[in-house]
Amino acid sequence: INKYREWKNKKN
């Protein structure tokens, strides 16, 4: 899962 990783980075 890296879509969540990208989203988490954008969310932060």
From Swiss-Prot:
Tissue expression per record: Expressed by the venom gland.
Primary localization class, coarse: secreted
Annotated compartments: Secreted
GO cellular component, as recorded: extracellular region
GO molecular function, a single term: toxin activity
Annotated keywords: Secreted, Toxin
Membrane spanning stretches: none
Family note: Belongs to the cationic peptide 04 (cupiennin) family. 06 subfamily.
Name of the protein: Short cationic peptide-6d
